Amino acid sequence: MGKEALLNLYRIEYRPKDTTFTVFKPTHEIQKEKLNKVRWRVFLQTGLPTFRREDEFWCAGKVEKDTLYLTLSNGEIVELKRVGEEEFRGFQNERECQELFRDFLTKTKVKDKFISDFYKKFRDKITVQGKNRKIALIPEVNEKVLKSEEGYFLLHLDLKFRIQPFETLQTLLERNDFNPKRIRVKPIGIDFVGRVQDVFKAKEKGEEFFRLCMERSTHKSSKKAWEELLKNRELREKAFLVVLEKGYTYPATILKPVLTYENLEDEERNEVADIVRMEPGKRLNLIRYILRRYVKALRDYGWYISPEEERAKGKLNFKDTVLDAKGKNTKVITNLRKFLELCRPFVKKDVLSVEIISVSVYKKLEWRKEEFLKELINFLKNKGIKLKIKGKSLILAQTREEAKEKLIPVINKIKDVDLVIVFLEEYPKVDPYKSFLLYDFVKRELLKKMIPSQVILNRTLKNENLKFVLLNVAEQVLAKTGNIPYKLKEIEGKVDAFVGIDISRITRDGKTVNAVAFTKIFNSKGELVRYYLTSYPAFGEKLTEKAIGDVFSLLEKLGFKKGSKIVVHRDGRLYRDEVAAFKKYGELYGYSLELLEIIKRNNPRFFSNEKFIKGYFYKLSEDSVILATYNQVYEGTHQPIKVRKVYGELPVEVLCSQILSLTLMNYSSFQPIKLPATVHYSDKITKLMLRGIEPIKKEGDIMYWL
């Protein structure tokens, strides 16, 4: 691994000696969402790796049976008839190749053997001992088949770690200190992760239920667990059963919660990060080792995998200059700290009325807070903004609960201010599943009044040099009060507006009850023009036509005229119905549209010793690109985004250059961000909304989420 940028993508071919496949077809139409479940059961029953081609199931080899009867987990029986034998002449798409490849991995157990060997060898190194528990980092090998621009298949092979406690969900539920609703869990011995929808006691069900579950189970671990529950009445008295969102039911004894960084204590989080954020060279060597094991195990079955990584196709140029209100500009290479010290913001409000709240256990840091406020006032004064302190409140509290009780009357009295600055104590960490966070409470209560807040943790004031904290806070104060720290000098191509749109599902009691489309509209200078929240009954992950229509109505209201070029960034997949609605309203309002999907997770990685890799790209097709959007300033391996143009006229390279420019628009820190401003913070906004933190007014131009 040198200066060039490699990707964990490997050319893959399937050239079996025996090209005979047995083809089965259902006697009745199968619902689309059940097709993969049926395919999996065809593989289990025949023992032959299988892929699906439309409504046919192709088995790699000869099957003598004329009819297959497959029982799904819900008890439904699917009948397949043998159509005959066909000669395999190649895959028609990536999915077919991926399905067959994964079945061969299961058949040879090469993947399971690697994970088992790795865990045994490095168990001590990938186990984290917290204060009250042990945490295991379980290796996960992920495979996905993609297609290159040239038309050959590529194996995307990656290694990650799943964070989970040693205890099963059953143990945690027995202790009654864990709310499992909506958490992700993984069944032991099953390559699947799902979200918890419901939990109930096993004793509520009769023996017939357990017998049917045992018979329908397709994995040894779950079949054994159901068998034990069927035989042991005492076990059923205390056992919990868990229903996942996709309808699967499992005994809690074989489920392990999948933790996130938010679920970890600080010391746990740091230790986990040291392991998970693996040095790029080390990660690549491990991937190569896994690949060699795959090659050896699958060679005799006709699989040929190149040992060579694919290489980046080139490096995109982009407009990387920002400017201030006086026309001073700078090229952003690493960060914006020096520019922020000297720049003159675009001032929309030059006098800010501010309320100060200080929450502490003791008074000893109050002098430090006063010192910090003086520096903040002077800093903003030099920027042309007067900070006018309307009032101050000091709250001394020994616990989070006491602090909340004392905060309520203070917050209730606040009105007619532009911002509330809150110095906040960090009380002992709580379980986020069952306790409130003081930060959430403050943010939520002030947003009910449509007042933005700036929270400063008391511990940050213990730093000897407050300049870093001061700059960061000042930048956010500007953005939260409608003032603009800086703008883009220019951007590639002619664009009038960028629209970032995402959908989050709001859950109550484990059930999705409504969805919120979050829209952010930016002008060609990267300046936020408006955010807009629209809520409607949930229909999976899709945007409704009404939500899309609202975006166009808002664009017109904001003054974007017919003929305007509108570039839409969808955080995630654009569905066919969504594309049709965008095109319909684009024509209706007379806008020229570019529709892009931005996929931020589970993409191939770039590996390079070069620090400045922002702009490297790999084209999967004429309209699909893997794009490096930041330089190697962080630990760990670079995680690029995937950009796919779904509709429009501009070349995907121009659209990617625009994305690179929009990564400079970050008002919450000095570093450019991984995602363009259009979709950056989508995850945070969603999490805030799930915790009840959202503005009363669903439309505005204040970045309350910073």
From Swiss-Prot:
Region (PIWI domain): 449-706
Keyword Transit peptide annotated: no
Region ranges (N-terminal domain): 1-108
Coiled-coil regions, chain positions: none
Protein residues bound to Mn(2+) 2: 502, 683
PROSITE patterns: PAZ, PIWI
Cofactor comment text: Mg(2+) is the preferred cation for DNA-guided cleavage while Mn(2+) supports both DNA- and RNA-guided cleavage of an RNA target. Ca(2+), which is found in the structure, does not support cleavage. Cleavage probaby requires 2 divalent metal cations.
Additional comment: In the structure with dsRNA, the nucleic acid is not found in the expected channel, only the two 3'-terminal residues interact in a possibly physiological manner with the protein.
Protein name according to UniProt: Protein argonaute
Gene: ago
